[in-house]
Amino acid sequence: MTMGEALAEARARIGSAEAKLLLRHVLGCSASEIAAHPERALDESQASHYADMVARRAAGEPVAYLLGSREFYGREFRVTPAVLIPRPETELLVETALSKVSRGDTPCVLDLGAGSGCVAITLALELGCAVTAVDVSAEALAVARDNAAWLGARVNFVESDWFAAIDGEFDLIVGNPPYVAEGDPHLAEGDLRFEPMTALACGSDGLAAIRRILADAPRHLKPGGWLLLEHGYDQAEAMRELLAGAGFVALERHRDLAGIIRVSGVIMPE
């Protein structure tokens, strides 16, 4: 089978862009090589591997898991089914966090729900400081540690159920906790079917994890420290009420490129 023939079969199942992306991954070649040499033959192993990848994608498996990586904030992160796939909207959380740190400062930073480590590692590299990151999943932390080693980031990863194994206070606490309601029909659709449910959903309204974080965060924030949390597209008002109920003031709300509030932040009173 030639590259051109393999692509033609794959396009009928998963579309042209993904067919080319998976073929590049299998062959380790560029898009220009594929375009220039459609007559080039695949060996038996390559053809079998490519057919398997196409079948898995056609069944709905996320491209990021098939490739084993996903780009986030200009860097490639290893991903496996043990971690949530990094999303572009989470870059808003990183950008907001960076805006809270003055140039030259070396803040003490905590990331809640590390997953692949994309947020903690990005902050560590962008700020040039050490970051602590927690996750309840040992499997997720293994992926995060690999990413930190690969990218050269100073991150202390701790297996912890939110603040349970954490001592001390921080200048900046960030988190992308699960915020989808359990039973939400979207959880049975698309890529979400393959991602770790504990990283996606928590509680009947999706806010159970956030309530736990807000209950303990004041004990771990330095005076003047910031708490920044990503949340669902329709949870801005609920977040305002929860943050006010937890005694926080000076609420900030940050919108994504579509104008939707996706990050809420508060400052610990001096």
Give the predicted meaning of each segment.
Residues 22, 60, 90, 119, ...:
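Residue-level signal for inorganic ion chemistry
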Residues 21-99:
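Conserved AdoMet
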